[in-house]
Structures are given as C-alpha cells and as structure tokens.
Amino acid sequence: MTTTYAVLSEGLEKNYGAVHALRGLDLAVAEGAVCGVLGPNGAGKTTAVRVLTTLTAPDGGSARVAGHDVVREAASVRAAIGVTGQNSSVDGELTGRQNLRLFAKLLRFRGEAARIRADELLERFELTDAADRPARTYSGGMHRRLDLAASLLTRPRVLFLDEPTTGLDPHSRNQIWAAVRELAGRGTTVLLTTQYLEEADQLADDIVLIDRGRTAHRGTPAELKALIGSYAEVVVPQASALIPAAAVLDQLTGAEPVLDHERRTVGAVATDTTLTLPRIVRELDAAGVPLIDASLRPPTLDEVFLRLTGRGDGRTSPPLKETAA
C-alpha cells in the first residue's frame, strides 16, 4: 500500500548568517499521523516549523505540505494548515470569544459562520464558562487551549504545534495532550515539536530526533527504544557505593554510567541483549557493592536521546548527567 505524506522534506537547509540552523533535514509524516520532532534548544525544531509553514524560505532542499510546495505554492500550504507557536497569538484585552471571532473574520468567515465556529471551539476546548472574560485573566493552560482553538478555525488538514506545552503545569499539559489525541482520532495530521520526551512518547506515532539541524534518527517510540537495548539501574544504600557500582555497570554495559547522588542510583544503557538482572546482581555482590534494589527495563526516550545523540535533555525525568550531592 502506498503511503501518502502530509509533510515531506528532503535536504532542507536554512542559514542565518554563519549559523546553519538546518543542515539537510529530512522529514516524512504520513497523513493522519502524529509525528514528534525532538531535540534540545538550538537543534532546529522551530526553524523547521517556520520553513514548513511558509514563514521563512529555505536556503536549500525542498518541502511539500498537504501536497503543495512550500515555496512555489505557499498560499495553498497556508490554506491547508493550522499553527500554534511558542508565543501566544491571543489578545489579552479581548475575551476568549472575541479573540476567536476576530481570527475567524480575518480568515474570511462570513456572517454567522464566525460566531458559530467560535462557539463550537470554545465548547470543544472547555472554555465556554470563561468565554466572556478577558484573555489576560486566563491561566497558561487556558491560553494554550485558546491558541489551539484559533489554529483549528479552518479545520486544517495539517496542524503544526511548536512546543505547545512548554511552561505549563502537569494538569494543563494533560489537557493539551487530550486535545491532540482527539485531533489525531479525527484524522488530522499533527507535527509536534517538543523538548519533553515523555510528551512524544505519549502522543507520537513516529518520532524524529533532530540534532544540530540534521535528522539523527527516526522511528516509532518502540523502534527507537529497541535500538539501544535495556536500561540497567541500581540503588545503593550510601553515596560511597556509587562509584564502585558505576565501575561494575561500566564493565557490564560498556556505556558511561549516570550517577544521581540525591537518589543514590547508578544507571547505564545496556546494549548487550544477553545481559540479565541476575548477572548484574551477582557482579555487584562479587565486587562487594551493597545493594538496595536493581532493575533492567526498557529505556525511556530520555535515555534513547542521550545514547543516540551523545547528550541528554532531562526535561521529564532526572537529568541525564551526574547530579550534585
């Protein structure tokens, strides 16, 4: 069966003076899929969104969104997409209802159509009770939901979400996640950039890891986790046992261990698929390392990112580096 791509880029390049923001970025997002684009600050995520949404022209390569070239058919691309960026587009002095009606009129909704569509979206995003309050009185999560509602006024085929939950509390983040799941269930293609690896794990059908403007790896969450094997972690009773435990894990896994003094844990990615938990326990015992607990589990996306790019993110789990005592 032939796959139809809602977003397709090949060798995408973008420079800002001497800064190479995109260095041959390749993306392929199937229609109706949720694609998570991951990377640390400066990786090129926002630049990629700006190019794909026609806000800035590429310096090389090509890209098509909803079947249209982002350079030659920019107007057609804009008619087919919705965008929610990192910065709110909401006017704080207007009410939520007024904001949506204003956006609708700017999008050339006629007559009662603007009112009807605004009311539909206010209800859909649970903003009806606050619809007639100034948006400046909204919480961060409500602002984001109003932004998302505005991006859906035209029922876009493709929705771009650029770090939509950055700075939100867990409850507000879960509300945005629920909205994205609902959109995906209705067949909307979603390209989501995020620094929160748990977010991509929860929402994305496919994940693209971007590092320094290039596509580092891509695949489903399960496929990416399978690339690096399991994650071994041990808990020791005192800080003095961390270094000896790290030496054992280093020998067993061949990967640099991660020490967390506060939690008194040592962890390392185990690429050796034959490594077992009993062997880990035996080797620690043979080395005289006291032990409270040990585990061998599938890796998180944090650990995948660290292993595949050589640097961690640490936004949703303990930082992937040695922490201070």
Language model features with spans:
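ABC transporter nucleotide-binding domains
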Residues: 4-9, 14-212, 216-217
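Solvent-exposed beta-strand sheet faces enriched in polar/charged residues
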Residues: 10, 235, 260, 295-297
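Preference for bulky hydrophobic residues occupying beta-strand positions
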Residues: 14, 27, 234-236, 268, ...
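Conserved NTP-handling cores and scaffolds of large molecular machines
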Residues: 107, 228, 232, 253, ...
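A short linear hydrophobic-aromatic micro-motif
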Residues: 127, 254-258, 290-295
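ABC transporter nucleotide-binding domain
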Residues: 177-271
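C-terminal coupling/interaction segments
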Residues: 272-325
